Swiss-Prot record:
GO cellular component: a single term: plasma membrane
Similarity remark: Belongs to the complex I 30 kDa subunit family.
Membrane topology (UniProt): Peripheral membrane protein
Top-level taxon: Bacteria
Enzyme class label: translocase
Source organism (scientific name): Francisella tularensis subsp. holarctica (strain OSU18)
Reaction equation(s) it catalyzes: a quinone + NADH + 5 H(+)(in) = a quinol + NAD(+) + 4 H(+)(out)
Main location per the UniProt record: membrane
Gene3D superfamilies from the UniProt entry: NADH:ubiquinone oxidoreductase, 30kDa subunit (3.30.460.80)
Protein name as it appears in the record: NADH-quinone oxidoreductase subunit C
Its job: NDH-1 shuttles electrons from NADH, via FMN and iron-sulfur (Fe-S) centers, to quinones in the respiratory chain. The immediate electron acceptor for the enzyme in this species is believed to be ubiquinone. Couples the redox reaction to proton translocation (for every two electrons transferred, four hydrogen ions are translocated across the cytoplasmic membrane), and thus conserves the redox energy in a proton gradient.
Amino acid sequence: MIVSTKLQDHFEKITKILSGFGVEGCISYGEITFSIRDQRDIHLILKKLKKEYLFEQLTDVTAVDYLTYGQSDWQVGKVVSQTGFSRGRQQDFKTAAVDNRFEIIYQLLSMANNVRIRVKCKLKDAQIILVDSVSDLWPSANWAEREVYDMFGIYFNNHPDLRRVLTDYGFVGHPLRKDFPQTGYVEMRYDENLGRVVYEPVEIDDRVNTPRVIRN
């Protein structure tokens, strides 16, 4: 693929700025991506990018759970029928600590230099996941980090108000984790006798309805 001269120039300049850190960069499909090796360097590197290459906007913060990455099928044992995929088995996951299970991703924009980049980092501990907040660098990170915490259970050190933002404050679990059941753990309904909303254990059977498909 032919890379534009301007994009290559931006890539080389940013690579030079980050030369003192454990960072790997690439240009793929017309996009610049940098991967940070040590999550403890995230705040310092992003601060450096904002100051020295004028990335004054953080457009998004998100995460990815790689718990089942690379598995070509659900773990369904011997329940695959002759007519195709079985619908009679609940999918179970191993939830033990897995290094590099989660990856956090930052999307940055420099209007002064007319360039966007992606900065990402694999997180080392899958049980206690702690990343320094960048809400002091970009106010837009405040709610974006709250969403990542809510959906993935990643905690942000020094965040001013780390609360759930999409689910209820009493919600159990983190819905975008691969080991979170599709039915959830509890369901909510209005109880006329009590005059309030109540939570009850989910009574829906969790069943695998479709085969797992990974496309190259």
